[in-house]
Curated annotation (Swiss-Prot):
Classification via Pfam families: TPR_1 (PF00515), TPR_11 (PF13414), TPR_16 (PF13432)
Repeat (TPR) residue spans along the chain: 14-47, 48-81, 83-115, 116-148, 150-183, 199-234, 236-268, 269-301, 303-335, 344-379, 380-412, 414-446, 505-538
Annotated keywords: Repeat, TPR repeat
SMART domains xrefs: TPR
Official protein name in the record: TPR repeat-containing protein MJ1428
InterPro entries to which the protein is assigned, alphabetical: TPR-like_helical_dom_sf, TPR_rpt
Organism, as annotated: Methanocaldococcus jannaschii (strain ATCC 43067 / DSM 2661 / JAL-1 / JCM 10045 / NBRC 100440) (Methanococcus jannaschii)
Keyword Transit peptide: no
High-level lineage: Archaea, Methanobacteriati, Methanobacteriota, Methanomada group, Methanococci
PANTHER family hit by this protein: CELL DIVISION CYCLE 16,23,27, CELL DIVISION CYCLE PROTEIN 27 HOMOLOG
UniProt key word Transit peptide: no
Length: 567
C-alpha cells in the first residue's frame, strides 16, 4: 500500500496537491493541509496564495516560526497584499513581537474591517497604555455589522472603569447581559446596583436614627428592616437593630444582631458595642476581649475605652477605670455628634471625679451637662446635673435640677428618690416625707412599699436614713454611634475595599468628594481615585481571584483618619 501511495503521489500534479490542500484547510485539518501545500510548492513555488495558505495552516498549528517564513515568501511575491500583512501581524502577535504586530495589523485595518483585528489592536494598545485608542478599537470590534464580539465590549467596559466612568461601564456590561445573561460581568453589574441601593438607603438610615432619638423604636426597626430588604449586607442596619434590642434589654437578640454586623464588616465600632452587650449578659471576660479587639482595630475608639472604664469602675478597680476614662478624654472625637461628645466627656469627667476623689472634675463636667440640656431638655440630663450638684454638696441647686427633671418626667422614681435624699440632707424632713409618700402612690410593689415604709418610719422618728444617691455611672444610657453623611460614605469606602470590591469603594469615594473642601484632602482623594480606577480594571481582570492592594488600603485608612472617621 505504501508503495502504491508513493507512486500515486509522484503522479499528482501541482493542481492536485493544491486542491487536496485546500480541502484539508477548509475542513480545519491543518497538519494534512501543510503536507499538501509543501508538496504543491515543491512543484511550483511562485503562487503567493499557496504560501499564504501554508502560513495560515501553520499559524493554526501554533508553528509560528515556520508560519512567519511562509508568509514572508508570500509577501516577497505580493508585497502589497493587505491580507498577507494581516496574517503576518497575527503571527508576530503570537510570537510576542508586539511592535511588529501593531505595524502590520494597523496597516491591515485601513482596508480590512474585521472584529478580531480591531480587538487585537485594542489589546496591543492596552499593553502600551494607550487606553483611549484601545477603547476606540474595542468599540469598533463590537459595532461591526453582525458582530457578537461581547468580549470586545467587556474589554471596553473595563476601560470605562479605568477612566472612572461608572455609568458607561454599567451600560456596556448591561448590554452584554442582555445577550448573555450568564456572562462573568454579571457579578460586576450586581455589585454596582447593590452599592447604589446602599447609598440611596442613607436617608432611610438617618430617619431611623431620628426615630431612635425620639424613642420611636418600633418605627426605627421598620426602617432598618426596609433597608435590609434593599441591601442585605447593610452592616450598619444590624448595628442599630442591636442598639434597639439593647434598649429593650433583649441582650441575646442584641448580640445576635451585632455578630451579624461583624460578619459583614470587621469594624472596631461593632466590637465596642459587642463589649457593651456581653457585659450586660454577665460575660465580663468576653466583654473585655471585645473591647480590646475594638481598640486593636482602632486605637481611637472612645466607645471601647468608655466601656472598659465603666466595667472596671463597677468592679471596684478604680485605678484601671480612671486610666480608661483618661483615654476617652484624650481621644480626638471629631467624627462624633456634639451630643455624643458631650455625653462621653460628661460621664468620663464624673468617672475621673469618683475614681480620684478630685472635685474639680465635677465642675468641669458641668459645662457638658449644660450643653446637653441646651441640645435636649431631657429629664436624664437634669438628673445628672442634680447629681453633680449633690456630689459637690450644693443641695439647693441639686434640688432645683431634680425639680426640673420632674417637670419633664413627673413620675420618674429615681428622680423622686434622689430629690427626697437631697431634702433630707437639707433638713427639710417634712418635704422628704411628702416626696416618699408620692412615690408610694406611683409604685405598686410590696417589696418597694416595705422599703419606703421603713424610710418613712425613720424620717417620722427624726432618725437619719443615711441614704446616698447612687452614682450615675451605674445608669449609663445605651451609647451608639451616629455618623454624619461623610463618615457614613467613608466607612463604606473602607468596607468595600477591605472586602476586595474596588468598584463599590470608587463609587463611595466619588460621593465623599462632593463633601470635601480642604485642598490637602482633595488631593488625597484624587490620588486614591486614580489608584482605585486601576484597581477596578484589575478587579475585572481577576474577578474571584482579586485581592485589594495593601498600599491603597493604607491610603484609604489615612484619608479616613484625616476626615476624623471611626472604623
Amino acid at each position: 500500500m505504501n508503495l502504491f501511495r508513493k507512486i500515486s503521489e509522484k503522479l499528482k500534479s501541482y493542481e492536485d496537491w493544491v486542491t487536496e490542500a485546500n480541502y484539508y484547510l477548509d475542513e480545519g485539518i491543518y497538519d494534512k493541509a501543510v503536507e499538501c501545500y509543501l508538496k504543491a510548492l515543491e512543484k511550483k513555488n511562485t503562487n503567493p496564495i499557496d504560501w499564504f495558505n501554508l502560513a495560515y495552516a501553520l499559524y493554526h498549528l501554533e508553528k509560528y516560526d515556520s508560519a512567519l517564513e511562509a508568509i514572508n515568501e508570500a509577501l516577497k511575491i505580493s508585497p502589497s497584499n493587505i491580507y498577507f500583512a494581516y496574517l503576518k501581524g497575527l503571527i508576530h502577535y503570537k510570537r510576542g513581537e508586539i511592535i511588529l504586530a501593531y505595524k502590520y495589523l494597523k496597516k491591515a485595518s485601513e482596508k480590512i474591517k474585521n472584529e478580531e483585528l480591531f480587538e487585537i489592536l485594542g489589546d496591543i494598545s492596552v499593553k502600551y497604555g494607550r487606553y483611549e485608542e484601545a477603547l476606540k478599537y474595542y468599540l469598533k470590534s463590537y459595532k461591526m455589522a453582525n458582530s457578537k464580539n461581547l468580549n470586545a465590549l467587556f474589554k471596553a467596559g473595563k476601560i470605562y472603569l479605568l477612566f472612572g466612568d461608572i455609568d458607561k461601564a454599567y451600560d456596556a456590561f448591561n448590554e452584554i447581559l442582555q445577550q448573555n445573561p450568564s456572562h462573568e460581568c454579571k457579578k460586576i453589574v450586581e455589585c454596582m446596583e447593590n452599592v447604589v441601593n446602599a447609598i440611596n438607603s442613607y436617608e432611610d438610615l438617618n430617619n431611623g436614627l431620628t426615630m431612635i432619638k425620639n424613642k420611636d423604636y418600633i418605627g426605627a426597626l421598620k426602617i432598618f428592616n426596609k433597608v435590609l430588604q434593599i441591601d442585605e449586607n447593610s452592616d450598619i442596619s444590624y448595628y442599630y437593630k442591636s442598639v434597639i434590642a439593647e434598649i429593650f434589654e433583649e441582650y441575646k437578640k442584641a448580640l445576635e444582631y451585632i455578630d451579624k454586623s461583624i460578619s459583614i464588616f470587621n469594624r472596631s465600632l461593632y466590637y465596642a458595642k459587642k463589649g457593651d452587650i456581653l457585659y450586660k449578659l454577665g460575660d465580663e471576660e468576653g466583654a473585655i476581649e471585645a473591647y480590646n479587639k475594638a481598640i486593636k482595630l482602632n486605637s481611637q475608639n472612645p466607645y471601647a475605652y468608655f466601656g472598659l472604664a465603666i466595667l472596671y469602675y463597677r468592679k471596684g478597680e478604680l485605678e484601671k477605670s480612671s486610666n480608661f476614662f483618661d483615654k476617652v478624654l484624650e481621644t480626638y472625637l471629631e467624627e462624633l455628634s456634639e451630643e455624643d461628645i458631650s455625653a462621653l466627656n460628661l460621664y468620663s469627667l464624673i468617672g475621673k471625679a469618683e475614681t480620684t476623689g478630685i472635685p474639680k472634675y465635677y465642675h468641669e463636667a458641668m459645662k457638658y451637662v449644660d450643653n446637653l440640656i441646651n441640645l435636649e431638655n431631657s429629664s436624664r440630663w437634669w438628673y445628672v446635673k442634680g447629681y453633680i450638684y449633690y456630689k459637690l454638696g450644693n443641695y439647693k441647686d441639686a434640688y432645683e435640677s431634680f425639680m426640673n427633671a420632674l417637670r419633664v418626667n413627673p413620675k420618674d422614681i429615681s428622680t423622686l428618690k434622689s430629690l427626697a435624699i437631697v431634702l433630707e440632707k437639707s433638713g427639710k424632713i417634712d418635704e422628704a416625707i411628702t416626696t416618699y409618700t408620692k412615690i408610694l402612690k406611683i409604685v405598686n410593689s410590696l417589696q418597694f412599699t416595705c422599703e419606703i415604709d421603713n424610710i418613712l418610719e425613720k424620717l417620722r422618728s427624726r432618725k437619719p436614713t443615711n441614704l446616698e444617691i447612687p452614682s450615675v455611672l451605674f445608669d449609663i444610657p445605651v451609647m451608639y454611634h451616629k455618623p454624619n453623611i461623610t463618615c457614613f460614605y467613608a466607612s463604606n469606602l473602607w468596607k468595600y475595599m477591605a472586602n476586595n470590591n474596588p468598584i463599590g469603594a470608587y463609587i463611595y469615594l466619588s460621593f465623599i468628594e462632593s463633601y470635601i473642601s480642604l485642598d490637602e484632602i482633595s488631593q488625597m482623594v484624587n490620588d486614591i481615585k486614580s489608584k482605585l480606577s486601576l484597581e477596578m480594571y484589575r478587579y475585572c481582570e481577576l474577578i474571584d481571584d482579586y485581592k485589594s492592594d495593601e498600599s491603597v488600603l493604607m491610603q484609604i485608612k489615612e484619608l479616613l483618619q484625616k476626615l476624623g472617621c471611626m472604623l
